[in-house]
């Protein structure tokens, strides 16, 4: 089965294209759903040894499809576990299905006998030899903002995956989906989030399911979360942030126990060059979502 997409919220369109699946649906996890004639796993004509840099969802999906096609993938993962940033994305109390997805990928990688080299960070793919192709799946890193005190912010990984103590009043710098989900998780813990968002609406994103975003917007309103739209943080002090409304010019302060960097992510830096043909998948190409990560990984694995 596929997941139906909602079309628009306050003029923000949903760009999940449906034209090649009879305008019915697309599945984030399985590109072949309802599109079996277009997307099929075809055996490779010439098996290749492929290095995959990064063991997140994109890296694991690439490895699994490559293995099914007869290639020999090897995953290089800089930490001691698979999952990448999706570990953080699935860390919230209401993300049990996402946790199960990581478990499924790990199990499938193990069942397929795919080689994994943990605690191995590749900073220059030029050092890799003996591979016919290289797939870079290194994901993204938090965006930074050049304002005084920015170093005081915590990342989503520190908040969600590492469970850093944050106190009661938690200020989110940015009101995208990640911030709203994390804020909702804090609400469930009895804490009091505050959101400062530069745009005129929360989750002003054109590639997110409206069912999810509408629920989060409603949750912020229902729980009376202070939301400051059209605003930007200009300075971060000890327990207090200076905020400016970009439309009216009004300035004010917001007190907090901790502040979270929720202004988004940027692709990881390039890793050099290699004589082997190189591909990229996931957020290191462009920041996307679970579907864009899995679909691009699937397509790249089919192109090798």
PLM features: residue spans?
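Active-site/binding-pocket entry motifs
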Residues: 9, 30-36, 141-142, 159-160, ...
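Rossmann-like dinucleotide-binding cores of NAD(P)H-dependent redox enzymes
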Residues: 75-112, 183-233
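Short acidic/His/Gly/Ser-rich catalytic and metal-binding motifs that mark active-site loops
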Residues: 36-37, 82-86, 144-145
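Cysteine-cluster motifs in flexible loop/terminal segments that predominantly coordinate metals
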Residues: 1-47
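Rossmann-like dinucleotide/flavin-binding elements
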Residues: 44-78, 117-130, 137-147, 157-208, ...
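Positively charged, proline/Ser/Thr-rich regional signature most characteristic
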Residues: 11, 15-25, 136-151
């Amino acid at each position: 089965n596929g997941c139906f997409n909602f079309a628009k919220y306050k003029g923000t369109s949903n760009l999940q294209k449906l034209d090649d699946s009879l305008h019915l649906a697309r599945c984030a996890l399985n590109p072949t759903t309802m599109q079996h004639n277009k997307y099929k796993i075809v055996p490779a004509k010439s098996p290749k040894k492929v290095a995959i840099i990064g063991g997140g969802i994109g890296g694991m999906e690439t490895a699994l499809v490559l293995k099914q096609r007869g290639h020999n993938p090897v995953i290089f993962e800089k930490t001691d576990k698979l999952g990448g940033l999706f570990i953080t994305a699935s860390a919230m109390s209401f993300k049990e299905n996402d946790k199960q997805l990581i478990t499924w990928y790990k199990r499938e990688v193990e069942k397929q006998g795919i080689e994994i080299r943990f605690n191995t960070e590749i900073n220059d793919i030029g050092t890799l030899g003996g591979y016919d192709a290289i797939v870079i799946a290194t994901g993204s890193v938090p965006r930074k903002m050049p304002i005084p005190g920015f170093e005081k912010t915590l990342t989503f990984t520190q908040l969600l995956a590492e469970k850093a103590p944050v106190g009661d009043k938690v200020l989110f710098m940015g009101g995208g989906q990640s911030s709203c989900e994390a804020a909702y998780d804090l609400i469930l813990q009895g804490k009091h989030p505050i959101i400062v968002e530069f745009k005129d609406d929360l989750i002003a994103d054109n590639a997110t399911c409206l069912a999810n975003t509408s629920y989060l917007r409603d949750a912020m309103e229902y729980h009376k979360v202070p939301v400051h739209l059209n605003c930007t943080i200009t300075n971060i002090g000890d327990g207090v942030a200076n905020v400016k409304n970009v439309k009216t010019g009004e300035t004010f302060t917001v007190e907090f126990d901790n502040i979270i960097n929720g202004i988004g992510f940027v692709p990881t830096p390039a890793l050099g060059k290699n004589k082997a043909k190189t591909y990229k998948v996931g957020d290191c190409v462009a920041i996307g979502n679970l579907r864009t990560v899995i679909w691009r990984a699937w397509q790249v694995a089919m192109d090798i």
